[in-house]
Amino acid sequence: MLAKRIIPCLDVRDGQVVKGVQFRNHEIIGDIVPLAKRYAEEGADELVFYDITASSDGRVVDKSWVSRVAEVIDIPFCVAGGIKSLEDAAKILSFGADKISINSPALADPTLITRLADRFGVQCIVVGIDTWYDAETGKYHVNQYTGDESRTRVTQWETLDWVQEVQKRGAGEVVLNMMNQDGVRNGYDLEQLKKVREVCHVPLIASGGAGTMEHFLEAFRDADVDGALAASVFHKQIINIGELKAYLATQGVEIRIC
């Protein structure tokens, strides 16, 4: 059985790490490289960096900090932000990233997923999905351009359909960003995760809602996700990664202990 992964998420804007609530009202957390180094030393299995305004600004992720991160950490890391072409992806991978993640550009042109997977291999192609639960309809819908509140829009895709579509096109991993839960720290949306797990046959990463160690346990035990991504609880030092992993191990979760 593969070990479950604990993945700190660093949202990047204007060269700094920021964090919002439900993708809004972002506050500055700190500098990118020192935070990355800290999380690697604490025992993170992987890091994810989202340049949150790259797609909505029509630019690619700022490459200068990617190479700096690669120099100071020895764990895999994934970079997302405005990657719209094979050339964009090649540059970011050449600067030291292990994976690239696409979100809004994949919605704009789903063939991008296949082209990237064919060129670089499915193992390094992640598709991020920003999903919002509509209480009126009882359905989950995919959102686009979520890094800019003024441009965020609901797409025609229902989340479960898009999860299946991206797999057909070559996604090697899916990160499910549950927008309703983002930053509120009251737990992952387990019901949604279970539904997605049923149709997701590649590694599935839960994102949005972690507030306690128990929330991570629930995601692994009840929804059988492969990894749990979180930001606020790590940035604000509410949860220490080493202590979290020790707790999960005592609960019978297969986890890499540093």
From Swiss-Prot:
Q: Which family does it belong to?
A: Belongs to the HisA/HisF family.
According to its UniProt record, the EC number is 4.3.2.10
Matching Gene3D superfamilies, A to Z?
Answer: Aldolase class I
Q: How does it assemble?
A: Heterodimer of HisH and HisF.
Its subcellular locations are: Cytoplasm
**Pfam (any one):** His_biosynth
**Role description:** IGPS catalyzes the conversion of PRFAR and glutamine to IGP, AICAR and glutamate. The HisF subunit catalyzes the cyclization activity that produces IGP and AICAR from PRFAR using the ammonia provided by the HisH subunit.
Q: Does the keyword ATP-binding apply?
A: no
Q: Does the keyword Flavoprotein apply?
A: no
This chain is encoded by the gene named: hisF
Which pathway does this chain act in?
Amino-acid biosynthesis; L-histidine biosynthesis; L-histidine from 5-phospho-alpha-D-ribose 1-diphosphate: step 5/9
**Single GO biological process annotation from the record:** L-histidine biosynthetic process
Q: Which organism is it from?
A: Shigella boydii serotype 4 (strain Sb227)
Give the molecular function GO annotations.
imidazoleglycerol-phosphate synthase activity; lyase activity
Name this protein carries in UniProt = Imidazole glycerol phosphate synthase subunit HisF
What catalytic activity does the UniProt entry give for this protein? 5-[(5-phospho-1-deoxy-D-ribulos-1-ylimino)methylamino]-1-(5-phospho-beta-D-ribosyl)imidazole-4-carboxamide + L-glutamine = D-erythro-1-(imidazol-4-yl)glycerol 3-phosphate + 5-amino-1-(5-phospho-beta-D-ribosyl)imidazole-4-carboxamide + L-glutamate + H(+)
The residues annotated as the active site are: D11, D130
- One GO CC term on file: cytoplasm
- Give UniProt keywords alphabetically: Amino-acid biosynthesis, Cytoplasm, Histidine biosynthesis, Lyase
Q: Which InterPro entries match?
A: Aldolase_TIM, His_biosynth, HisF, IGPS_HisA/HisF, RibuloseP-bd_barrel
